Amino acid sequence: MNYIDLSCPAELFRTAMPTEEIPAATLTLFNRSDRVIVSVEVLLRLLDEDGGETERLAYRGRALNGRPHSTFLLTVPCAPSEGLKALDVSVEKVWYADNETWRRDPANAVEYTPNALPVSPALTNLKYAAGETAVGYPSMQNGLWVCVCGRPNPEGEPCCARCGRQMETVFSRFTPEAVETQISLRERQLATS
């Protein structure tokens, strides 16, 4: 299970572990808002292979240029180690160019199960049907719908906050059955060509 604060304007999109060459965790964040983000404070937990916390770092990145509806990078200095296997990142506070702020409220966190598929023929077929941003089949979960791109959204939201796909389209075109139908149709088209 994972947790997400659906109100957070800076969504964690991707992480890169620290290495000897780059002794820092590189976080790719997505600015969901209509305003420029200039600073982000994160809490970074470094985890071992059993999920145990080996280190905890609070870091504030400044002079960022998080353009609206775009990705931007935040580099958190930390040394690599042999036991480091994963990162757990929590966005704690966001500063906008207009001096407004957003602060995480633990009461807003909602639990969800990620839908990411492992590298497999099923994922390849899904990417054929839904595009390269697809990570897993959509699902409905306790007041949320998880998009094909992996983003949880409130049940009443008609469009995904990350990729903009409509919920109706996601659930009609990208279920396992719908993807299989698309693949079968394409195979028949190729066979008759």
Roles of regions detected by a PLM:
Residues 1-32, 36, 41, 49-50, ...:
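Low-complexity, acidic Ser/Thr/Pro/Gly-rich terminal tails and inter-domain linkers that flank the onset
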Residues 25-27, 40-42, 57, 72-74, ...:
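Hydrophobic residues positioned within well-ordered beta-strands of beta-sheet architectures
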Residues 34, 49-52, 98-101, 150, ...:
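Detector for glycine-centered tight turns/loop "hinges" at secondary-structure junctions
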Residues 36-43, 55-56, 161:
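Short, hydrophobic/aromatic beta-strand segments
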Residues 50-85, 97:
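Intrinsically disordered, low-complexity Pro/Gly/Ser/Thr-rich segments with frequent PxxP/GP/PP motifs
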Residues 93-106:
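Short acidic/polar inter-strand loop motif in beta-rich domains
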